[in-house]
Amino acid sequence: MNRLLICALMTVALSAASSAVNAAKIERIVTPGGIEIWHVHDNMLPMISLEFGFVGGASQDPADKPGVANLVASLLDEGAGDLDARAFQERLEERAINISFSAQRDSLRGSLKTLVDHHDQAFDLLRLAVNAPRFDSSEVERVRAGVLAGLRRRTTNPGDIAGDRWFARAFPDHPYGRPVQGTLETVARIGIDDLRAFHRNTIARSNLKVATIGAIDAQEIAAFVDRVFAALPQEPQLVSVPEVVPQGGGEQEIVDLDVPQTVIAFGGIGLKRSDPDFIPAYVLNHILGGGSFSSRLYREVREKRGLAYSVYSYLAPYDRAGLFMGGVSTRNDRAAESLAIILDQIKKIAEAGPTAEELAKAKSYLIGSFPLRFDTSGKIAGQLLEIQLENLGIDYIDRRNGLIEAVTADDVRRAAARFLANARLLVTLVGRPDPVPNPAPATAGRG
């Protein structure tokens, strides 16, 4: 039995997932060690999925060494305890166990997927990875080389360049302005002491969120979660990350790159997830640029004029900042036209709001598509973790569609007035746009 089996099982859809995963069936468990778990007991597959996150993430990187969190995440399963990297990976492979870690701006996250028959060994391996990563010098250098190779590729990828440059200009002197992956220079300077310090300061019990689903009861999962996490320090030693708003509103940066298309990234102030107007703003953005084939941006940029294959906007609610962002990739000689259309559509929806038909269709789609977020056990655990990290409450799944349905035209107009009307965007273009677009007007996005 190998990882192909676990992958096959994980892709089996869970029928009636959204109705099965509701607040009545999500158990809130507090382990003997004091760790809170949101658990769904499900016997449909002989599987257990666990998702967890530590609040902190890349925002905890030293200011002069971005990339530490990402390198730590890449190394946690590369040898732990008395198992070197090869032995650790062999144990995973032999038992079809999948363990992975990732770093984001506001959290360090991990995932475990295992067959029930191997859950004892799986949780033991996860315990070692979380508590006793080796950070052997040979593995650090091997993984570092892979990260550096990826960073070299990013230096020639227009989309990556646009995103990194946008964040750097929007958040100077703030952790959000530093790339999660680091840079070629900073990753080369990260030492093993930096990795150990990040692990020691960030991974603790009080900033831990855990979500599980599978063929295991509450008492068993509590014991296994304690086995993994109970020996961690109670409190992390986190660096305070200040609230921030994106800078550079109305500014435009062109990064010269010899490519046939220009990639445009734009953004400004949005709303944080805790904001009462976030749901109306979410519905509004779906109409503007979040609804793929149904959005105004898609219709005007792609469908009517054929300027781009993809154009989009989205809300990005970070812990310390709420953002409204978007992007498009188009021919160099059509970049100015594409950007002008995007800004014009933002202006129009900010001033007049959506039509009644647009609002009704958006709400219907957002409600009807919600079950797709829960059609595998991995997705369910991931959603439960996300809800915890965003402090939405254990009953959010039950409440969410009602919140969407309750959005009125007045709600949407109010949200638009807060983050789109009389606003200014920071725009980054990567390529060789000709003609050069005019800077974003004052009515198109706020920075």
Roles of regions detected by a PLM:
Residues 146-165, 248-262, 299-308, 319, ...:
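Short acidic/His-enriched helical or mixed secondary-structure segments at domain edges of catalytic enzymes
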Residues 26, 51-116, 156, 179, ...:
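M16/MPP (pitrilysin/insulinase) zinc-metallopeptidase core fold and M16-derived inactive scaffolds
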Residues 81, 87-198, 266, 360-378, ...:
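Acidic/histidine-enriched segments that form metal/cofactor-coordinating
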Residues 78-82, 113-144, 291-292, 312-373, ...:
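M16/insulysin-pitrilysin zinc metalloprotease superfamily fold
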Residues 172, 176, 180, 204-205, ...:
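An aromatic/glycine/proline-enriched structural segment found at the starts
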